[in-house]
Amino acid sequence: MKGYRQSTLLICSILTILALMGPVSKLSAGENQPWTDPKNALIVDAYELNTIEWNAFLQDKRIAGFISKASDGLPESFSCTGDHAGDTVAHCKTMWRKYAVSRELFQTRRMLAKTNGLLWGAYHLGRPGNPIDQANHFLDYADPQPDELMVLDIDGMDTTQFMSLDDAQIFVAHIKIRTGRYPILYTNHNTAQYIADHRGTYPLLSRLPLWYARYKPDVKGTFPLGNWDSYAIWQFVSSDNCSEKSCPYRVPGTLTDIDVNVVPMTKIQLAKIWPQGDLLPAKPLPAPDLTIALASMCSGPRQPLISLMIDTVVTASTPPSTKPVEINELNYEDF
């Protein structure tokens, strides 16, 4: 039995090494600068302050889609009285004009994009406030058609600036009730990681197709992430990593503040799945951390190694016994 203890220690060592190494994964085609492959389609997203020279913009034939900012938080007030009266009335009127002009620009860009064969999508920037009112605001503003993509944008975890994840659950459920489709989720890595780690708490958010904002040349080791085997859309260019001197991809007719996205598929393939609307399959919740189990098994208090039934010499004075004999670290050499 000396070999038993040595084998146990060896197994513990091997399992510990494997646990620390984690899963081994290869770098898939969509993880390393997929925008450099001319077959992969590109998508531009913009808001009202991004300037676009459309004649030049439409010359880039890799651009397959355009996603525009639609609504932002709760709807604007139609009245500049009451809470808006007094010194803020001029500001209120200015904000309302900005809102009206932004909505008209949204509608104009949609007409231009779809007339020129681009796929169209719209996003709502989630803010603090009633999520059902925000969902209704988005639907009233964007008026999404069956062939258009819908997006909920959660820019971070700070609930003083952005919609909480609990409210986001309510938002997407209400969109589903009113349209028959779920939106996809736009967010950054930290928020996506948190949702994935708490997918039992956020069963809807964690199963929405992921529009992933990450400004690095690759996403090796990121996926699978919870229910997400990969991204649906990868935002790889923004003002954070694009300047006059250096930019991963430049779209003609735009400035360095434009957002550019890639999908690991052709324009034809993208068009077939563009409207989205379904939830991803739910994966089983993770088992307890292997390293914790190993710590308990290999580093815990001294435990019996094994219990065996020891055959004894049976005589009239020593009847057979069924009581197990414990073999432990103190007496294993006796056996």
Question: Model-derived features: where do they sit?
Answer:
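Solvent-exposed loop/turn segments at secondary-structure junctions
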Residues: 47-52, 70-75, 125-131, 155-160, ...
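Alpha-helical scaffolding within the catalytic cores
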Residues: 47-56, 100-112, 129-145, 165-170, ...
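Bacterial N-terminal signal peptides that target proteins for export
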Residues: 2-11
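Bacterial N-terminal signal peptides
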Residues: 11-22
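Catalytic domains of cell-wall/extracellular-matrix polysaccharide-remodeling enzymes
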Residues: 149-224
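N-terminal carbohydrate-binding/catalytic regions of secreted carbohydrate-active enzymes
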Residues: 37-121
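Structural recognition of the beta-strand scaffold that forms the well-ordered cores
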Residues: 41-45, 64-69, 119-124, 148-154, ...
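Functionally critical loop-and-helix segments that line ligand-binding/catalytic clefts
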Residues: 30-60, 64, 203-333
